[in-house]
């Protein structure tokens, strides 16, 4: 049996991971659950899964969790708190694989801890690659960590890669593997056909609905602005060592075809699956083998003639274009982009700014800050903090 630490267990990816584990209790068990401050869900998960450790980033949340577990009779679960303990649980010798699903820059340190311990990392945290992709892929090679992407698009590309590319992720050029380009699909978000003039009136409640996927509030807004796809573009650049000319983004509202790989010999491999995150999670957990999975629906071959594809108009999605521009600029620019976006989205969710203000805030922060590329995690966090401070000052004016 293989043991897991789940970073971000109370979020949508964490819940989906636990769902896969519950279908395969003969193959996997939970060593530790880690979350920020959602005590209610963490309590339920601890009672259901009986991990050896439960860690809350918030000390106050950890105290409440401990009381809840004592009340529930779960005396054998050790409750910890803080980022340091999260890092320890991600790197301990008692763990075979780590699900990195903490949303935002908060997932950076625990994920790097797992990396430096040579773990099998199921990478769902976009920000690790967006903010530290160069450093992360370099150290993945150094510590021989196995990186398996969880985002449906990157997971789909990974499945369509030749074994040599899978085994040397980020180090082998696509052209050397006979690949001419990779294609990521994008649903276009909930406001795909909404006239531009109406976007200023969009509410957080409207933006937090995704047409195909079940996701958290922040990621749902990122999907609506298409920043999510911009971040995925940056991820793909690092994960697959791809040049800008080797990546294409294609609008596909149904989210059935997740990615395509074009080979130089004329072959095109497309990956199709229902929009259910348990599918890429199960693939990554079992890799290089495969395991069965009970899902509510499967692909109906007769439905395929109803699928739609279209070119992406970057002008309609300013957040996406900002991500492309930042990636073309520098690693520090993508750190600033990510930090400014997190603050802008939070401000929108709190109704401090409008939906269409989000790209304006990001653009102003990018224009205001110019720092050297990071050499280590502390540099990343410094640049991130400076960008957040600037974004906050803009949002509260």
From Swiss-Prot:
Residues bound to NADPH? 10-13, 38, 125, 127, 216
- EC number(s) recorded for this UniProt protein: 1.1.1.267
Gene Ontology molecular function terms on file: 1-deoxy-D-xylulose-5-phosphate reductoisomerase activity; manganese ion binding; NADPH binding
Its annotated pathway reads: Isoprenoid biosynthesis; isopentenyl diphosphate biosynthesis via DXP pathway; isopentenyl diphosphate from 1-deoxy-D-xylulose 5-phosphate: step 1/6
Q: Which reaction does it catalyse?
A: 2-C-methyl-D-erythritol 4-phosphate + NADP(+) = 1-deoxy-D-xylulose 5-phosphate + NADPH + H(+)
* Lineage top rank: taxon: Bacteria
The GO biological-process annotations, alphabetized, read as: isopentenyl diphosphate biosynthetic process, methylerythritol 4-phosphate pathway involved in terpenoid biosynthetic process
Q: Does the keyword Methyltransferase apply?
A: no
Q: Which UniProt keywords apply?
A: Isoprene biosynthesis, Manganese, Metal-binding, NADP, Oxidoreductase
Q: Where does Mn(2+) bind?
A: 151, 153, 232
Q: Where does 1-deoxy-D-xylulose 5-phosphate bind?
A: 126, 152-153, 187, 210, 223, 228-229, 232
Q: Which cofactor does it need?
A: Mg(2+); Mn(2+)
Whether Manganese counts among this entry's keywords is yes
UniProt similarity note:
Belongs to the DXR family.
Role played: Catalyzes the NADPH-dependent rearrangement and reduction of 1-deoxy-D-xylulose-5-phosphate (DXP) to 2-C-methyl-D-erythritol 4-phosphate (MEP).
What protein is this chain from? 1-deoxy-D-xylulose 5-phosphate reductoisomerase
- Which species is listed as the source? Blochmanniella pennsylvanica (strain BPEN)
């Amino acid at each position: 049996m293989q043991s897991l630490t789940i970073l971000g267990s109370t979020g949508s990816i964490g819940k989906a991971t636990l769902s896969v584990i519950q279908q395969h209790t003969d193959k996997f068990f939970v060593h530790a659950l880690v979350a920020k401050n959602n005590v209610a869900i963490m309590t339920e998960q601890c009672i259901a899964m009986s991990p050896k450790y439960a860690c809350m980033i918030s000390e106050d949340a950890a105290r409440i969790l401990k009381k809840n577990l004592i009340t529930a009779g779960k005396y054998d679960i050790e409750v910890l708190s803080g980022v340091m303990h999260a890092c320890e649980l991600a790197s301990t010798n008692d763990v075979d694989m780590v699900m990195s699903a903490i949303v935002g820059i908060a997932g950076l340190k625990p994920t790097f801890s797992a990396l430096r311990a040579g773990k099998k990392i199921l990478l769902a945290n976009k920000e690790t690659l967006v903010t530290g992709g160069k450093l992360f892929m370099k150290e993945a090679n150094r510590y021989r960590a196995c990186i398996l992407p969880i985002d449906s698009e990157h997971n789909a590309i990974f499945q369509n890669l030749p074994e040599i590319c899978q085994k040397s992720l980020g180090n082998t050029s696509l052209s050397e593997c006979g690949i001419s380009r990779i294609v990521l699909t994008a649903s276009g978000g909930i406001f795909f056909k909404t006239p531009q003039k109406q976007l200023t009136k969009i509410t957080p409640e409207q933006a937090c609905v995704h047409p195909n996927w079940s996701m958290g509030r922040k990621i749902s807004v990122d999907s609506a602005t298409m920043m999510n796809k911009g971040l995925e573009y940056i991820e793909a650049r690092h994960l697959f060592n791809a040049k800008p000319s080797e990546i294409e983004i294609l609008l596909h509202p149904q989210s059935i075809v997740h990615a395509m790989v074009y080979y130089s010999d004329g072959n095109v491999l497309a990956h199709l699956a229902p929009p259910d995150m348990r599918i890429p999670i199960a693939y990554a957990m079992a890799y290089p083998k495969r395991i069965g999975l009970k899902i509510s629906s499967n692909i109906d071959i007769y439905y395929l003639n109803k699928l739609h594809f279209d070119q992406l108009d970057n002008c309609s999605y300013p957040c996406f274009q900002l991500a492309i521009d930042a990636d073309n600029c520098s690693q520090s620019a993508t750190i600033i982009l990510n930090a400014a976006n997190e603050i802008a989205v939070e401000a929108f969710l709190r109704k401090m700014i409008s939906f269409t203000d989000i790209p304006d805030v990001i653009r102003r922060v990018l224009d205001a800050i110019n720092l050297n590329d990071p050499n280590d995690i502390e540099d990343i966090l410094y640049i991130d903090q400076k960008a957040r401070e600037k974004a906050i000052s803009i949002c509260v004016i």
